[in-house]
Amino acid sequence: MSGLGILVLTLLLLVYMATSHQDAGEKQATQRDAINVRRRRSLTRRVAEECEESCEDEEKHCCNTNNGPSCAPQCFG
């Protein structure tokens, strides 16, 4: 095989390796994002459940405000 053919094959191999490594990194980042979203949802759900339970004792509604969930006789907005 000529030197030019070997050079072309080497370049193709390098390009393939670089793109497959990049794809693996993107896949890993996507999986990490999915895990973070699940954690965030479970935390939000837990806070909402705690708010509802504590407000239920006071016979009020759990309302989301800028400062987080709070108990109020009636939620606005």
Swiss-Prot record:
Keywords: Amidation, Cleavage on pair of basic residues, Disulfide bond, Knottin, Neurotoxin, Secreted, Signal, Toxin. It comes from the Eukaryota. The modification Phenylalanine amide is found at F76. GO terms for molecular function: ion channel inhibitor activity; toxin activity. GO terms for cellular component: extracellular region. Pfam families: Conotoxin (PF02950). Disulfide bonds join C51-C63, C55-C71, C62-C75. Expressed by the venom duct. The keyword Disulfide bond applies. The keyword Zinc does not apply. Its main location: secreted. Residues 19-44 form a propeptide. Residues 1-18 form the signal peptide. It is found in: Secreted. The presence of a 'disulfide through disulfide knot' structurally defines this protein as a knottin. The cysteine framework is VI/VII (C-C-CC-C-C). Belongs to the conotoxin O3 superfamily. This is Conotoxin ArMSGL-0141. It comes from Conus arenatus (Sand-dusted cone).
